[in-house]
Structures are given as structure tokens and as C-alpha cells.
Amino acid sequence: LFGCSTTQQKTGETDYTQYVNTFIGAADNGHTFPGACRPFSMIQTSPVTGAIGWRYCSEYVYTDSLIWGFTQTHLNGTGCMDLGDILVMPVTGTRARAWDSYRSHFPKDKEAATPGYYTVELTDPGVKAELTASPHAALHRYTYHNADSASVLIDLQHGPAWNENQYHSQVQSCETNWEDAQTLTGHVRNSVWVNQDYFFVMKFNRPVIDTLYLPMAETEKGKRIIATFDMEPGEELLMKVAMSTTGVDGAKKNMEAEIADWNFEGVKQAAHDEWNNYLSRIEITGTDDEKTNFYTSFYHALIQPNQISDVDGWYRNAADSIVKAGNGAFYSTFSLWDTYRAAHPFYTLMVPEKVDGFVNSLVEQAEVQGFLPIWGLWGKETYTMIGNHGVSVIAEAYRKGFRGFDAERAFNVIKNTQTVSHKLKSDWDIG
């Protein structure tokens, strides 16, 4: 047994991130990921070791020996798959290859992670990859030990899928534009679990000297681009990617607000400090193994729900309209049939400043689609599982004294959810 107490301890006194093992849960069917993210953020930048089949809901299995690349969004601990957007992979050597031949072996003793940071040595291209993140943007640092045709694969077709056919057909449209030699922007629409639109801006700290577009299969619409750089062995390439649901301008605003320069160590430290601030809210006594178990679970609980609204509060809602969140932030990734029992009660205790935002997000989505989210993702509805557990989440928040939302609006969407038939609610009409 171990003791537990909430604290107001200054984060500088103890580094609680030392007790987080981001690889826990990443074995077969644990469906967690080891990469870098911020609490409740849009971005989760993490390695991909596979993408096809239920085993790869998070795109990573600890025992795998090949890394496909690094994607910028991930689901954490779910039993369904989606996201896995914008795969990038540093490569060297022959540029024109089959789309799946840029993957690399990696030694497990050269892979490491801590909250907000991930690193690995990629054996085949001879590159050290490092990842960190802000809430809406990822920042990568690649050190090319071998600079022969130093390049980056940008794969916009990629995404976790149930089978090979879906993997090669999930992208419905893909538009890209090189705004200058260092900036790529784009818009991708895809459909795996939910219909998703995302916009992005990708910037490099040095100019692209050549691009190669790989051939696409008949069912593919997502582009695969090889961007090549003039580099010497030992030099670093920095790349940052910001995303938005609203448009390229939204992605640019997110990048400018959060990662305006190329200070990798600064972003990494800010990510560490934010995680430590949250983790320091609970102090436990016990063995190091018990602390690792506890703080890793605490960490995983704070990865979602995810703020998908831009830094200025705008987001794409369930009707594909661009609107501004009522309280400044809109959250999605609500696996409510899982989280209503323990996670949401936990949030009311440990992150009370987030609770009103969660409730307002549920209410806003309900007012658009006609009923409370069942399993909300990327601002849309997946219609996954039965019942509607958002009711208890809102009721609990109100019962515990949270008043940062309109109680009458909340009651009306609860009533509408429970008493009105909605043809969009799959095959379980309430009569």
C-alpha cells in the first residue's frame, strides 16, 4: 500500500516526470504511445511501428523492430483507430524507392522518452531523431550522421487502418502548396473512424533544394513527398508542424503563438515543466515501482480530452462550420463510455480548471448534432458504443458545484438526448 495526498508543492522541488515511463501500455494491445505531447493537447508526435490491424490503434508496439516514421496525432489507449496524421521520416541514400522501403531498424537501447520528449537512433539512414511538442505543434530535430541525399519523407496517405485496402483508400482529398523553399502547407480530408479535416503548416530551418513526388496507387489520394536538403554529416535539421481544424491560417497562428523560433531545448523544457506542474498535484509515498505505476497512470489520464480549437478559440464543429468556442477552448476525444466512471470524476478533483471547458464542449457539440456526444473525436461523432454517458459527466459537474457553463442549456441537451429520437444515432432508436 502507498500513501497519497494532494499538494501545492512547487514543481522545482521534485521532478515527478522521473516516475513516468511512457513505454508502459505500449506492448501488444495496450494501445498507448511513447512520444511527445502536452496535457490535453491537439498534438501527440510519436513513432510508428505499424498501422494495419487492431494491434496498431496507437501505431506503436514496443517489441517491433522497425520504425515507419513519426506521425503528429495519436489516440491513447483506445480500442479503435484513427488520427496518425502527417507521417514524416528522415532518410538518406537512394531517394526514389517503393513507398514502404524508407523504414528503419533501431536499437532498443537507443530509444528513450520522458513526458514531452522522445528520441531514437535510426540505424538505416544513420539519423538521430528527437521529438517535442507544444499544444498545437510538433518540433523535430534530426541529426544526420550520414548526409548522403539527406531528405525527409512526408507521407500524407498514411494513417492507421483496419486493413490494407482501407490504408490505401482512406484519404478522400489532399492539397499541398510549397509557399517557399522552407514552408509546406496543406489540407487533408480522410475517413477511418470519423470524417476528419485537418490543415497544416510545416517549416524547416533550412531550404529544401529538391522535391520528389512518389507514385500513388489507384485508390490513393494522399501525397508522398521526398524533400531533400544540402547537409554535411553531423548537421541538424529542424522541422516544425502545426495543425488546425479551421484552415492553413489557423495552423500558422498556432505555430506563431507556440513555436515561433527554433529553440528545441526551450520547447522541450516547457513541455517538461507543464507536465511536472500537473503531476506535482499529487504526492505519494511508496517504492519507486509503485511511484512509476501511479505517475504513469496519472500521465496517461491527462493526455485527453484534446483541445482541438486554435489558439484564438476557433474550431470546425460537427456540422463542418467554423465557429468560436464559447469559453475559449473546445475539447474532443471523449471516450465517454470509458471515462465517465473514473476519469471525469478524477478531473473534477485534480484538474478542476478544465471541467467547465469539457462540459461546454459537450453542450456545444450536442446543440449542433442534436444529442450529447457518444464517442466524440475531432469535433465529430463516431457513434461508438451504447448509451450516452455524457449525461452523468454533466450532472456530476453540476452536483459538485461547477458553474462555468449555462445550466439551462446543459439541461436542455440532456433532455433532448434522452427524450427525442434522432435518426443519426445509429440503430438504437429510443422510441
Tell me the role of every PLM-derived stretch:
Residues F2-G3:
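C-terminal motif of bacterial Sec signal peptides marking the signal peptidase cleavage site
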Residues Q9-S392, Y398-G431:
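Accessory carbohydrate-recognition regions in carbohydrate-active enzymes
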